[in-house]
Amino acid sequence: MVHFTAEEKAAITSTWKLVDVEDAGAEALGRLLVVYPWTQRFFDSFGNLSSSSAIMGNPKVKAHGKKVLTAFGDAVKNVDDLKNTFAHLSELHCDRLHVDPENFKLLGNVLVIVLAKYFGKEFTPQVQSAWQKLVAGVATALAHKYH
C-alpha cells in the first residue's frame, strides 16, 4: 500500500481539478502509442495507427484516452485505497485483455510528462514527486491481479 502525506494529496488534488481529462487523456494515450509502438497491439480495433499524426488524430485513441484519465480521477479520489479502486480494471486487463503490466508504468510516466507540459512552472518538483508516486501506485494496483 502506498502512503501519501497530506502535502502530496494536496499537490495531486489541486492540480487534478485543473486537468482537461479529454485533452490530456488523448495526449497521454497517443504519446504512449507513438513512443512505445509495441503497445499498439492492444488497440487493433482502433483503426489507423500508422503514424504519429494518425494516432494523435484518431477518435478512438482520444475516446479511450479520456476513459483512462477518468479512471485516474478515481485514483485521485481514492489515493488511500488504490488496490480496491482498481481491482476490477486489474482483473479486466489481466484476464481478458492480457496487457503486459509494464505498460501501466509506461503510461503513468507519459502522463506525468503530459501534466508537466500543461502546468509548466507550476509543476514543481514536489508536485511531480506526488504524481510519480500516484502513477506508480496505480500501476501497482493495476498489476495486482497478475501476481
Swiss-Prot record:
CDD domains tied to this protein: Hb-beta-like
InterPro entries linked to this entry: Globin (IPR000971), Globin-like_sf (IPR009050), Globin/Proto (IPR012292), Hemoglobin_b (IPR002337), Hemoglobin_oxygen_transport (IPR050056)
Domain Globin: residue ranges: 3-147
Tissue: Red blood cells.
Record's keyword terms, sorted: Heme, Iron, Metal-binding, Oxygen transport, Transport
A Pfam family recorded for this sequence: Globin
GO terms classed as biological process: hydrogen peroxide catabolic process
PROSITE patterns, alphabetized: GLOBIN
Function: This protein functions as an embryonic globin, but the gene structure and chromosomal location resemble more closely the human gamma chain gene, which codes for a fetal globin.
Family named by the database record: Belongs to the globin family.
Protein name from the UniProt record: Hemoglobin subunit gamma
Source organism of this protein record: Oryctolagus cuniculus
Gene: HBG
